[in-house]
């Protein structure tokens, strides 16, 4: 049920204070619902370090094509998605590029792009030197 959902995560590390993540969808005629969602943590969410370690272990098993326990993965994805509210949804449209702050929580809406694999080009832009991002500038202006 949840096996085709992506894991909600962020790409940030301590060196990514002024970094942008982006991706370009490269599957022609993909299922629109195989795009990307941006999330915010629910107010009552309390992150536990062991949750993060468990997620990394399962993710490594998945990427290395080890025999992953699909019931365990399904349970973890369900819990992961229950901790967040979706705020933005980008449909998978061929050659569409999206960008977001590396501190934004995000996931693949579905890993099933239809007849073909969900193919994306992921990139990071680091070392942006500016006083403030446009959104920060606008947010700090008096009304």
Show which residues each predicted segment covers:
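Catalytic core of non-heme Fe(II) oxygenases with the double-stranded beta-helix
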Residues: 2-143
